[in-house]
């Protein structure tokens, strides 16, 4: 079970299939995030290695990874966002790919 900080919530995307941990007081993923990730996923093949720079809470990376078997490196330098990303990846059982 993933623990949430006092100011965090779990949001869902792509129906209820994907769960993202977000800070209630910080930037949250939006339609723009999903549109960008949707366009990117269409050119990513299963054998690719993908780097997501400034990954934030990993919403775009998790969305892209849902649609293929590529390997992803999600890179984030802000401690809180990186923590949310790690826990979101675990929540979606994608630790072996992201």
Enumerate the predicted regions with their spans.
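Conserved SAM/SAH cofactor-binding pocket of Class I
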Residues: 38-98
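N-terminal start-of-chain detector that recognizes signal peptides
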Residues: 7-9, 23, 72-74
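SAM-dependent Rossmann-like transferase core, predominantly class I methyltransferases
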Residues: 3, 11-46, 55-67
